[in-house]
Amino acid sequence: MGLSDGEWQLVLNVWGKVEADVGGHGQEVLIRLFTGHPETLEKFDKFKHLKTADEMKASEDLKKHGTTVLTALGGILKKKGQHEAELKPLAQSHATKHKIPIKYLEFISDAIVHVLHSKHPAEFGADAQAAMKKALELFRNDIAAKYKELGFQG
């Protein structure tokens, strides 16, 4: 299930574009997640009051959280699958404190792919999309394994 060196290179090339505007990308990803899957908003007390995409766009807190999410994910992606140290505390907090179901990680993965494709169509063609989907699936599978170790059935 691992990625080839070439696939990792495709993932990291487009991730460089994300890092140039991590806050903007993160905000768009969360807006896409929350508008496409409103049930996910219930896990975020801080954002529950945001009902429209315009309200979400105006929220500095949402942008900050988007930055946090994509910065953490970028750190994991740069490990090219060797992300045990980064993944463990993330799985712990998402399983025990936030109680985020794996399904929601699938939803945000889809949102990430959509946002990257809409913002960077030239750099995020079919091969790069397939590589990113594979990298995000690897991340989710590893989180799911940690959830199981923690006794969380997310």
From Swiss-Prot:
GO terms for cellular component: extracellular exosome; sarcoplasm. Monomeric. Heme b binds at residue 94. One of its GO terms (biological process) is removal of superoxide radicals. Its EC number is 1.7.-.-, 1.11.1.-. The modification Phosphothreonine is found at residue 68. Keywords: Cytoplasm, Heme, Iron, Metal-binding, Muscle protein, Oxidoreductase, Oxygen transport, Phosphoprotein, Transport. Nitrite binds at residue 65. GO terms for molecular function: heme binding; metal ion binding; nitrite reductase activity; oxygen binding; oxygen carrier activity; peroxidase activity. Gene3D superfamilies: 6.10.140.2100, 6.10.140.2110. Residues 2-148 form the Globin domain. It catalyses: Fe(III)-heme b-[protein] + nitric oxide + H2O = Fe(II)-heme b-[protein] + nitrite + 2 H(+); H2O2 + AH2 = A + 2 H2O. This is Myoglobin. Disulfide bonds: none annotated. It is found in: Cytoplasm, Sarcoplasm. Belongs to the globin family. The keyword DNA-binding does not apply. The modification Phosphoserine is found at residue 4. InterPro entries: Globin, Globin-like_sf, Myoglobin. Monomeric heme protein which primary function is to store oxygen and facilitate its diffusion within muscle tissues. Reversibly binds oxygen through a pentacoordinated heme iron and enables its timely and efficient release as needed during periods of heightened demand. Depending on the oxidative conditions of tissues and cells, and in addition to its ability to bind oxygen, it also has a nitrite reductase activity whereby it regulates the production of bioactive nitric oxide. The gene is MB.
